[in-house]
Amino acid sequence: MAAKEVLFGNDARVKMLAGVNVLANAVKVTLGPKGRNVVLDKSFGAPLITKDGVSVAKEIELEDKFENMGAQMVKEVASKANDAAGDGTTTATVLAQAIVTEGLKAVAAGMNPMDLKRGIDKAVVAAVAELKTLSQECSDTKAIAQVGTISANSDESIGEIIATAMEKVGKEGVITVEEGQALENELDVVEGMQFDRGYLSPYFINKPETGSVELENPYILLVDKKISNIRELLPILEGLAKTGKPLMIIAEDVEGEALATLVVNNMRGIVKVAAVKAPGFGDRRKAMLQDIAILTGGTVIAEEIGLELEKATLEDLGTAKRVVITKDDTTIIDGTGEQEQISARVAQIKIQAEESTSDYDREKLQERMAKLAGGVAVIKVGAATEVEMKEKKARVEDALHATRAAVEEGVVAGGGVALIRVASKIGELDVANEDQKHGVTIALRAMEAPLRQIATNAGEEASVVANNVKNGSGNYGYNAGSDVYGDMLEMGILDPTKVTRSALQFASSIAGLMITTEAMVGDVPQEAGAGDMGGMGGGMGGMGGMGMM
């Protein structure tokens, strides 16, 4: 086991604070509308230019192992805030730095670290409760666009495209961000349920100009097995021939004689038909077939629940207004399933997604939920260069997370104003001693830090701006973008409550742990032994001998 180096008390805290400051100082320059960029060196390709706090934090690794421990703990704050709300990473880092700096000063002055932590925790609990009372619902498109704009560093086009996407696919809908081919941002909306399975035979195509199959008001047969014997399908086909309506088959596979007969029937015009493979694999395929059944008002024909294909009737089939099948995917538009059942299925999938421990499973469940709830929107980010593309895509993703958080828990006045108002409303808290009281003061003072940093980044005197805002009331604050004071909500400067809450909670949690740290243990760096180097030399000599042959 390698030898360890141990630091105690003030020596440990000084090193830890130095690491915290290096990371926080690099991150906090990005805060606010006039925040600066940070350039990150990459081992290959062009350097990355970003204003995303968590991206900067993740890059920082310090040479001194004890300073690095401090930096890594603050990095955890940024990562946690990013995971919980998808934004607010810089705010969380600024708050953590403020609490740690003041907390360690108090510890050095002889105060009890545990009591300081208890005081900080009490202040944060009171602040979170106060934030909830200040929070306002964010439901209209204009407010959603404003939240997206602020999070995307005042880029109105990003805020508007996200608001449009949410309007089209609903608040629960899936919105994905991709790299586009154009210079401008584009929005593609896929209405209805789409899955990545195309037609099983090109002979089903009835729209040669687009190379697709389009069926109007079709019946939809859902089968959880392979179909190879046409006799199993005859009762359904005979019933359909009388109605004159088209048929779409979704099965594990359709092959051999069954597929050949369907193609012949289709080409002769006896029955208009198309077949596709069911989406997914294993249990996910069964679940997705059930989703389609609920969406279209049909039944999945599966032998494991006692249903046989030969005995299926038209009543077992689902229906939809329209189906479009291309070489690669299938879209079912306006399924005729009961809205009550669809809503119940969405709620069931939502619970599964919340309980899932796998990110991949959660993503797939959210995708299924969106397909049932109304559709999928794809934002294609446009830019002139690859460097700009990466930076812009990160901003769009941040803005998307922020708008989702705003819809979930509402919004508060932005620009650091909400935390100032919260701090002013917290009166005398019930504390056990003076040290806990000082802990409360540390937390309340730290809540000014985001506003002060926004003002500093805008080139203003932080103390003057903070006093002006504190002397105001309600949503009165400082708009650093246009350098004016006024009502933040009217000026469209909003922060999602969830983002502000998460930043405060995670910052105080990690900062509390750092304040109560009394010792740090790290590996003693090992010097390379001379014997090892000699061994390498011998090997090289052997290679030289080989070269002489």
UniProtKB/Swiss-Prot annotation:
GO terms for molecular function: ATP binding; ATP-dependent protein folding chaperone; isomerase activity; unfolded protein binding. CDD domains: GroEL (cd03344). It catalyses: ATP + H2O + a folded polypeptide = ADP + phosphate + an unfolded polypeptide. Forms a cylinder of 14 subunits composed of two heptameric rings stacked back-to-back. Interacts with the co-chaperonin GroES. GO terms for cellular component: cytoplasm. NCBIfam families: GroEL (TIGR02348), PRK00013.1 (NF000592), PRK12849.1 (NF009487), PRK12850.1 (NF009488), PRK12851.1 (NF009489). Keywords: ATP-binding, Chaperone, Cytoplasm, Isomerase, Nucleotide-binding. Together with its co-chaperonin GroES, plays an essential role in assisting protein folding. The GroEL-GroES system forms a nano-cage that allows encapsulation of the non-native substrate proteins and provides a physical environment optimized to promote and accelerate protein folding. Its main location: cytoplasm. InterPro entries: Chaperonin_Cpn60_CS, Cpn60/GroEL, Cpn60/GroEL/TCP-1, GroEL-like_apical_dom_sf, GROEL-like_equatorial_sf, TCP-1-like_intermed_sf. This is Chaperonin GroEL. Its EC number is 5.6.1.7. Belongs to the chaperonin (HSP60) family.
